[in-house]
Amino acid sequence: MQGKITQVMGPVVDVEFSSYLPMINEAIDVNFDIEGRKNNLVLEVAAHLGDNRVRTIAMDMTEGLIRGQEVKARGKPIEVPVGEAVLGRIFNVTGDVIDGGKPLESDLKWPIHREAPSFENQSTRTEMFETGIKVVDLIAPYSKGGKVGLFGGAGVGKTVVIMELIHNVAYKHSGYSVFAGVGERTREGNDLYHEMKEGGVLDKVALCYGQMNEPPGARNRIAFTGLTMAEYFRDEKGLDVLMFIDNIFRYAQSGSEMSALLGRIPSAVGYQPTLAGEMGKLQERITSTKKGSITSVQAVYVPADDLTDPAPASVFAHLDATTVLDRKISEKGIYPAVDPLGSTSRILDPQIVGEEHHKVATGVQQVLQKYKDLQDIIAILGMDELSEEDKQVVARARKIERFLSQPFFVAEIFTGSPGKYVTLEETLEGFKGILEGKYDDIPENAFYLVGNIQEALEKAQKLKNA
């Protein structure tokens, strides 16, 4: 299965075989020396050109390749390590360990290109996935095997929310997480690794990085590398896995770069004509089966804040819930800075979450919306000009705002407050009490950065005695 290179165009390499035609997505190895240093480059077949010639995408830099160079087809797609051995380690797109640690002690490998679970194997039951984060569980609950879009600019706390979710899954569900850095900044990937190490969650997560400086093939396929590791835990171990993709926009962006290099005619805004199909290929594999589930949280970058751009628009079609982080909320010192009016969930329905949950969540949103509407009047005329009823709404809304904040386990080193996991029952009990006016006589400071309502009452007692 030997062949030779006939053309190199940046990350696209044409290869010719004398008596063999590799299948689409098959891996091809090229071993060559650059300045005396041995290099192993992996190519992936993307198109058949006829006459036993194939067009491939390189998974690493192609500097040093020359025409006529020998290559060897593997006869199978790229395979990556799976199983418990991958936890706490960092991998690149081809499954090599890149954290400078000891070699991997496992021979178990799975191909990155796999079929999505069939209809009969999928689980049709919609279950809520408890995260232990009050604002998420109350306003925009995640569903098991669902997909969540995490929208937010730089510095509003996307990474901290991701790390807390990884911690809570490990702590409450004894589950594992997989993090795929798709077109990530190397610095951010490095920071995340060290923060997870300090936060004590590294041994429950596998990290896969295809950074910004890598060719489009690596940035595109890294999502499949991470997903394959997650699928193993779901299908073989029967676990509920959490899968993080940061950033899903870069997956679409790298696909558009590859498409142009492969000579396909671009469609709207220069994106690949196969954008919807490629997005579906990835997203359809993220689902619940009868054995376990993969719940994914995907950070979504919105170019120029244009939600109608084809890339984010192709993601929206697949999302079950959106968690929107707002800078205005983080400026108030309320963390997590989730916008309770901007975040949505498909399962916030009385038939799925229950009548009480739905009633409390909509009640909270109504009070916060009323407070938002009154803010202009308060800014111009002050609180004294409001009616007694409106004053009560404002007081309750301010308590709700503060009660939506929560000390995180992974942020203990910054806040000095021990982290709190709040069950859904405790969350509903607390917000229901505020809406009913049970805690109207308690100062709003008592609700800031606490877990359940009991802690708020204890804090109020301490403030009173101080």
UniProtKB/Swiss-Prot annotation:
EC identifiers of the protein: 7.1.2.2
Binding residue positions for ATP: 152-159
GO cellular component: plasma membrane; proton-transporting ATP synthase complex
Entry-linked SUPFAM superfamilies: C-terminal domain of alpha and beta subunits of F1 ATP synthase (SSF47917), N-terminal domain of alpha and beta subunits of F1 ATP synthase (SSF50615), P-loop containing nucleoside triphosphate hydrolases (SSF52540)
Reaction equations catalysed: ATP + H2O + 4 H(+)(in) = ADP + phosphate + 5 H(+)(out)
A Pfam family of this chain: ATP-synt_VA_C
Top-level EC class: translocase
Predominant location: membrane
Topology in membrane: Peripheral membrane protein
Annotated localization: Cell inner membrane
Key words of the record: ATP synthesis, ATP-binding, Cell inner membrane, Cell membrane, CF(1), Hydrogen ion transport, Ion transport, Membrane, Nucleotide-binding, Translocase, Transport
Keyword match Ribonucleoprotein: no
InterPro entries (UniProt xref): AAA+_ATPase (IPR003593), ATP-synt_VA_C (IPR055190), ATP_synth_F1_bsu (IPR005722), ATPase_a/bsu_AS (IPR020003), ATPase_alpha/beta_chains (IPR050053), ATPase_F1/V1/A1_a/bsu_N (IPR004100), ATPase_F1/V1/A1_a/bsu_N_sf (IPR036121), ATPase_F1/V1/A1_a/bsu_nucl-bd (IPR000194)
GO MF entry, a single one: proton-transporting ATP synthase activity, rotational mechanism
Gene3D superfamilies linked: 2.40.10.170, Bovine Mitochondrial F1-atpase, Atp Synthase Beta Chain, Chain D, domain 3, P-loop containing nucleotide triphosphate hydrolases
Protein family per UniProt: Belongs to the ATPase alpha/beta chains family.
Function recorded in the entry: Produces ATP from ADP in the presence of a proton gradient across the membrane. The catalytic sites are hosted primarily by the beta subunits.
HAMAP family recorded: ATP_synth_beta_bact
Assembly mode: F-type ATPases have 2 components, CF(1) - the catalytic core - and CF(0) - the membrane proton channel. CF(1) has five subunits: alpha(3), beta(3), gamma(1), delta(1), epsilon(1). CF(0) has three main subunits: a(1), b(2) and c(9-12). The alpha and beta chains form an alternating ring which encloses part of the gamma chain. CF(1) is attached to CF(0) by a central stalk formed by the gamma and epsilon chains, while a peripheral stalk is formed by the delta and b chains.
NCBIfam families linked to this entry: atpD
Name of protein: ATP synthase subunit beta
Species per Swiss-Prot/TrEMBL record: Helicobacter hepaticus (strain ATCC 51449 / 3B1)
